[in-house]
Amino acid sequence: LLDEIACWRSLPKEKRILFASLLKGKKEFEGFLSMVSAEYIHKGIPELIKELYAGKICQHADLDMLINQYPCGLTYALALIDTTDYRSITPGWVLYNYPEVEFIIKLLRHTTCKESCDYCHTQLDVLHNLKTFFGYEHFRTYEGEPLQERAAQAAVKGKSLLAIFPTGGGKSLTFQLPALMAGHSVHGLTVVISPLQSLMKDQVDNLADKGITDVVTINGMLDPITRSLSIQRVQDGEASLLYISPEMLRSKTIEKILMARHLVRFVIDEAHCFSSWGQDFRVDYLYIGKFIQKYQQKKKCKTPIPVSCFTATAKQKVIQDICDYFKQTLNLNLELFASTASRTNLHYSVIHVENDNDK
């Protein structure tokens, strides 16, 4: 208790007044606020929040609604936003008692406003963050179409999508960038489902080469010590991106660590594996929707968790299967971003031969 009192008194006076005013009349905080002789204000709370958190939250967020409906959750959300370490995560007991905290943080820091305030114009702008995280000035285009940028921006806006980009066409960056942005803005975790363990390792290593270390993979190739360390990094909030295989979603350990984190998106790589019409059909892919359903129910999510599906090529029937699956299981509508299947750096032709000698 003495530590809590000391921590309270170390806060700037304006924030003590703000927090006390939000918590005034809440039975669970009455004793503490009385003990520290808290000061209150009755008007101007939204204006005080905007002043104290300028540059940290969207200036057009509906603060009146949050103050009226979720004063306790808003207080915890603002306290978490105050932390300088983006890897700090909300304690489990807070999420248990105030599950709205994750929703509030998303509303304040990861929901773009139509007016494009200073915060959204920089912190939620994909081109600005492309330079920040990867050092690139521009996104890749496909026959003059900025599909990569559009898909990344759609993800930042919270949309679910299906992107059909050619192999080597930059699909990884398209989901890695929004994931890193969400990790820094809302302490969120993006789960990437991939069927190939070697591909997971390659992507983690490539990001590490760029100085991006808040990425973890958990798969069957890891020795027990490395696996334990990877799990601990996810639990401690050190990961913004987690690569796993679809089979791992059935693991109780994986379920436990994901329940303790704020999941902001599921990314499904090689999404053609959903379709029985595809040559690489994986039955475990069909469990992804059920897992997301279960997670949303247990966490009492106020908004659906969006998904991003990626594949290099897909027939129309496969595309329809993917879209139908997420509509039926999660009631999600996938926005389609598709490039042509042709590769300008590859050419092939068919030459008819009559016999082995001609070959």
Predicted regions and their residues:
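Conserved pre-motif I regulatory segment
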Residues: 116-164
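Conserved helix/coil segment N-terminal to the catalytic DExD/H
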Residues: 180, 222-265, 273-279
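Conserved nucleic-acid-binding Ia/Ib motif block in the N-terminal RecA-like helicase ATPase lobe
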Residues: 191, 197-244, 336
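Conserved interdomain linker/interface between the two RecA-like ATPase lobes of SF2 helicase motors
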Residues: 319, 333-359
